[in-house]
Amino acid sequence: MTLLISNDDGVYAPGLNALYHALKDLADVKVVAPDRNHSGASNALTLENPLRLQYLDNGFIAVSGTPTDCVHLALNKICITVPKLVVSGINHGANMGDDVLYSGTVAAAMEGRFLGLPAIAISLAGQTHFESAAFYAKQLVGKLLASPLSTDQVLNVNVPDLPLAQIKGIKITRLGKRHKAEMIEKSVDPRGKEIFWVGPPGKIAEAGDGTDFHAIENGYVSITPLKIDLTATEQLSDLTKWLDK
């Protein structure tokens, strides 16, 4: 039995290493990850350039592409045995609310699900207690292997950046919301050309009870099921009426 692991922080990221060591006792683990940080890459595929592989001494494979490239390449060319599950993470920072639209971590899991496999994305709401995220990753992956989910969904998991003993449990949540990000930093490079830096995500706009933000803020692991089908089904009838006016 094989598990495929990827991430968006890159093949040398501590979170990826923590995830590998947490899961290696459950199955044969194949690690295929970007050769550098691709945070915020979303579902981008590399179409204009070839992908190059680097086989590392620890058995990991580094790819000169995005998280989605890594999973796409792994499932179509690298993996001899079809994995039972795609696991993405452990991300260095939370992926909650609108973050999931930009997240390379979530995108890697989405690509696995798009190609027909169960998938889970795991993020730590900080950069310290990877052991806590690794513990919950092992528990949840073990449960998915024993009792696979049959619906077309990806599990988006966020873990509080706390010592394991301080985490209160797990909550099933919905996505919260952020205000739009407005901060763009304008600067000048050494040659006098203007450059721009995209700022941090917008502030939290909706973090009520039942949201991923609320769970993390109160010391709980958040699990949010995500759908690949983005169709706003509830709006189909209204849109038809609007068109017929």
Swiss-Prot record:
Compartments it resides in: Cytoplasm
Keywords: Cytoplasm, Hydrolase, Metal-binding, Nucleotide-binding
EC number(s) given by UniProt: 3.1.3.5
Function: Nucleotidase that shows phosphatase activity on nucleoside 5'-monophosphates.
Gene3D superfamilies: Survival protein SurE-like phosphatase/nucleotidase (3.40.1210.10)
Gene: surE
GO molecular function term, any single one: exopolyphosphatase activity
Keyword Metal-binding: yes
The keyword Transport is annotated on this UniProt entry: no
Protein name: 5'-nucleotidase SurE
Pfam family, one: SurE
